[in-house]
């Protein structure tokens, strides 16, 4: 990868489109940005959908205490649709174009090609962190059995979960990360936002263990950095999706 390939685009939006993030934010705009960050943090939307599902008698666990794959798929895809809809509404309300925020001035095909080797980089980061934790801080391995592994024990469930990790993982989370980083440009800067968003991303994976949360938080920072340098979500989406799919393949092959 050359330095030229990874050079960030020039500041400013597309011709004729106001560069909202570059404007000096007013106090009111900061308050609005904070509200949008909270609403698009994933916690409110998932809580609302989970409550709605429960009201209709559709609960996450079966009578035997196992996590329902149907619930996870339905919640993840519904949350993806709701969250993307919210972000598009907020962008429209501020006169921002989704293409400018999510794709920038980069062409899609070259960005997708860049994302492929970044899958390997993401794998290296994940392996290095987990190996370091296992060597120097084994107490952080707080979950012996990842509960999500039970969702992919059959070919049908594996395919369903693959859909989830691509659509709700790779696509939704990278669009969400880009939107939140954009809003943090009004709330202390993108670098500050990268730290906050990465910590929140890691915290969302505590169900899988503290070590997994550290690894995923670091990976979130990596993908966020790629977005900030490229101003396009395409490479992070490809890298994130590929990383998730390889994790499924790993479990199917070696069983852990």
Task: Say what each PLM segment does.
Residues 16-19, 123-127, 135-256:
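Transmembrane helix-loop-helix hairpins at the membrane interface
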Residues 52-74, 95-168, 186:
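Juxtamembrane helix-loop-helix connectors linking adjacent transmembrane helices
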């Amino acid at each position: 990868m050359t330095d030229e390939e990874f050079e960030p685009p020039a500041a400013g939006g597309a011709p004729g489109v106001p560069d909202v993030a570059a404007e000096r934010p007013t106090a009111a705009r900061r308050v609005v940005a904070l509200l949008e960050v909270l609403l698009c943090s994933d916690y409110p939307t998932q809580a609302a959908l989970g409550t709605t599902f429960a009201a209709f008698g559709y609960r996450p666990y079966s009578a035997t205490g196992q996590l329902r794959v149907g619930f996870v798929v339905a919640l993840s895809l519904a949350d993806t649709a709701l969250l993307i809809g919210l972000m598009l509404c907020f962008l429209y309300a501020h006169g921002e174009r989704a293409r400018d925020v999510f794709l920038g001035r980069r062409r899609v095909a070259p960005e997708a090609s860049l994302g492929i080797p970044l899958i390997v980089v993401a794998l290296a980061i994940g392996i290095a962190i987990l190996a370091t934790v296992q060597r120097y801080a084994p107490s952080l391995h707080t979950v012996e059995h990842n509960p999500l592994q039970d969702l992919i024990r059959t070919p049908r469930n594996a395919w369903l979960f693959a859909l989830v990790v691509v659509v709700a993982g790779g696509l939704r989370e990278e669009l969400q990360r880009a939107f939140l980083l954009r809003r943090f440009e009004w709330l202390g800067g993108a670098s500050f936002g990268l730290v906050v968003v990465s910590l929140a991303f890691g915290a969302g994976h505590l169900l899988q263990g503290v070590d997994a949360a550290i690894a995923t938080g670091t990976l979130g920072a990596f993908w966020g950095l790629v977005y900030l340098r490229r101003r396009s979500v395409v490479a992070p989406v490809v890298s994130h999706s590929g990383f998730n799919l390889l994790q499924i393949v790993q479990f199917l092959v070696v069983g852990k």
